[in-house]
Amino acid sequence: MIFADRHQAASLLAQALAAYKGQHPLILAIPRGAVPMGQQLAKALHGELDVVLVRKLRAPFNPEFAVGSIDESGWTYVADYAASAGASAAYLEQEKQAQLAIIRQRRTQYTPLRPPIDPAGRIVIVVDDGLATGATMISALHALRAKKPAKLICAVPVAPPDTLEKIREYADEVVCLQAPAFFQAVGQFYADFPQVDDAEVEAILSQA
């Protein structure tokens, strides 16, 4: 299945998550692409919207390919293939510091007037527009688990089967609309997949 756009994907996810409507779930979107989807889910499920800030650690010769990820606390997930992708320990340390600086800058930028919403005791749904390696989602789920949510759910429109297996170790429930065996990039499953910029994220979060 090819999704028309993120709006359609979010509508279908909302249907799949309908059991949580009325339970005031906390929808945490991974910026930037998933933030408009998170807004839609929060409205459909009568929930609350915020962002969870994590960054992928980029492979040295292919910045689109993740060799790990880092969360706001500095906790780092390093994939078992990182070294074979050319990521030395020194490179990873440099990349961690660079991505952590971006996370801190984005927190100030995205929610300047309030602290992050506390997920403790809440049904938490972490949404992204799709998973490739799953590294970013793993960091998001790990960071949130430490904050003791009542239930931690990963919700994505599309991800490859091997990635979903890894994600299941970190979430109480995984909702994925399709898991194709042939998977190159998230964008191949959307007819329209525009970039979401910081201004759009800020506008959405200012209304949340």
Range-by-range predicted roles:
Residues 1-208:
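PRPP-associated nucleotide enzymes
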